[in-house]
């Protein structure tokens, strides 16, 4: 009996991909808090936008809440962790008023944007925030300043329609996970309309967002399908889908697990692009590769632009706790 040969497939695996330093740090903070203080450790909002990560932490004893008033009175001696996206100033103030011990897992690069926005405000500038309405990072950044101090711009059309109170006294910052190209277009339009618009001291879009978009741009041309591993509420993952399509992939999709793959829809392909958003764990990337290997004679080739070496320290209270490979195996494999 002849067994049909598997069709050949080239998988262009992008590097860098997956966890950035800020996401890695945030997950480590929850894991170390559980080791240090025991379960439950409460986390306000999803620590990162990935259900696999959230469920893995829940299995270890983390409890996710949307607001601090959801924490039972009998557990108020337990720590609460703020997510990597950052929070408005009112949240730590609320924690203090409730006598809660909190650990802030805000990405240091998001904290930098907060400081840039506050500096604009301190110098008397109205802050223009380029970002997506409703995203936790945008809510957190806007919440650093008094109400009315920030105007949100999402698109070039918004930039065209924006009418400031004082056009000569504006400063901008951006969400860290935006499309690099789209954001450049919005900034250019704002600068065209408001020549005195003050830029932040450093680019607000983070290194990981930029790096992941650049390698997807390089790998996408000629791909029959480009898969981005990530959650539907992950801003940076959704931007990667858009980047792949613009760069020449015939089709690009966002998936969270291999079980979501629709093989009838995928059909006959010969070249697959594969990357992962900054909150997607490597174990899922491997899961996707193995799913394709089960159906194709797959050859993986690495498409790499840069190697990332960034590393952010966890909170001082947790630095004496040992973090082992076993502690992080649920996301790293």
From Swiss-Prot:
UniProt protein name: 4-hydroxy-3-methylbut-2-enyl diphosphate reductase
Q: Which residues bind [4Fe-4S] cluster?
A: 20, 107, 206
Q: What is catalysed by this protein? A: isopentenyl diphosphate + 2 oxidized [2Fe-2S]-[ferredoxin] + H2O = (2E)-4-hydroxy-3-methylbut-2-enyl diphosphate + 2 reduced [2Fe-2S]-[ferredoxin] + 2 H(+); dimethylallyl diphosphate + 2 oxidized [2Fe-2S]-[ferredoxin] + H2O = (2E)-4-hydroxy-3-methylbut-2-enyl diphosphate + 2 reduced [2Fe-2S]-[ferredoxin] + 2 H(+)
In its UniProt entry, the species of origin is given as Rhizobium leguminosarum bv. trifolii (strain WSM2304)
Q: What metabolic or biological pathway is this protein involved in? A: Isoprenoid biosynthesis; dimethylallyl diphosphate biosynthesis; dimethylallyl diphosphate from (2E)-4-hydroxy-3-methylbutenyl diphosphate: step 1/1; Isoprenoid biosynthesis; isopentenyl diphosphate biosynthesis via DXP pathway; isopentenyl diphosphate from 1-deoxy-D-xylulose 5-phosphate: step 6/6
- Matches recorded under InterPro entries: LytB/IspH
- Cite the binding residues for (2E)-4-hydroxy-3-methylbut-2-enyl diphosphate: 49, 85, 135, 176, 234-236, 279
- Sites where the protein binds isopentenyl diphosphate: 49, 85, 135, 234-236, 279
Q: Which residue spans adopt a coiled-coil conformation according to this UniProt entry?
A: none
- Cofactor(s) this protein cannot do without: [4Fe-4S] cluster
What role is this protein assigned? Answer: Catalyzes the conversion of 1-hydroxy-2-methyl-2-(E)-butenyl 4-diphosphate (HMBPP) into a mixture of isopentenyl diphosphate (IPP) and dimethylallyl diphosphate (DMAPP). Acts in the terminal step of the DOXP/MEP pathway for isoprenoid precursor biosynthesis.
Alphabetically ordered keywords of this record: 4Fe-4S, Iron, Iron-sulfur, Isoprene biosynthesis, Metal-binding, Oxidoreductase
Q: What class of enzyme is it?
A: oxidoreductase
């Amino acid at each position: 009996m002849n067994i049909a040969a598997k069709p050949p497939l080239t998988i262009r695996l992008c590097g860098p991909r997956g966890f950035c330093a800020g996401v890695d740090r945030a997950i480590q903070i929850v894991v170390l808090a559980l080791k240090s203080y025991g379960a439950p450790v409460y986390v306000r909002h999803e620590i990162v936008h990935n259900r696999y990560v959230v469920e893995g932490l829940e299995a270890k004893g983390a409890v996710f809440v949307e607001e601090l008033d959801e924490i039972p009175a009998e557990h108020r001696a337990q720590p609460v962790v703020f997510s990597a996206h950052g929070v408005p100033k009112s949240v730590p103030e609320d924690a203090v008023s409730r006598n809660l011990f909190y650990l802030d897992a805000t990405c240091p690069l998001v904290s930098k944007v907060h400081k840039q926005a506050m500096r604009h405000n301190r110098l008397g500038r109205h802050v223009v925030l380029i970002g997506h309405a409703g995203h936790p990072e945008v809510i957190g950044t806007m919440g650093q300043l008094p109400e009315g101090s920030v105007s949100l711009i999402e698109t070039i059309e918004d930039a065209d329609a924006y009418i400031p109170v004082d056009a000569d006294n504006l400063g901008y910052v951006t969400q860290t996970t935006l499309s690099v190209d789209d954001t450049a277009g919005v900034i250019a339009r704002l600068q065209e309309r408001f020549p005195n618009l003050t830029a932040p001291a450093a680019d607000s879009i983070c290194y990981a967002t930029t790096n992941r978009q650049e390698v997807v741009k390089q790998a996408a041309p000629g791909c029959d399908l480009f898969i981005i591993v990530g959650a539907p509420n992950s801003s940076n993952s959704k931007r990667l889908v858009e980047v792949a399509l613009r760069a020449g992939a015939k089709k690009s999709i966002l998936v969270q697990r291999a079980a979501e793959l629709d093989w009838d829809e995928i059909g006959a392909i010969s070249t697959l692009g594969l990357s992962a958003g900054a909150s997607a764990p490597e174990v899922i990337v491997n899961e996707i590769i193995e799913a394709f290997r089960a159906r194709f004679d797959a050859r993986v080739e690495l498409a790499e632009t840069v190697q990332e070496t960034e590393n952010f320290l966890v909170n001082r209270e947790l630095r004496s706790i040992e973090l082992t490979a076993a502690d992080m195996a649920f996301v790293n494999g």
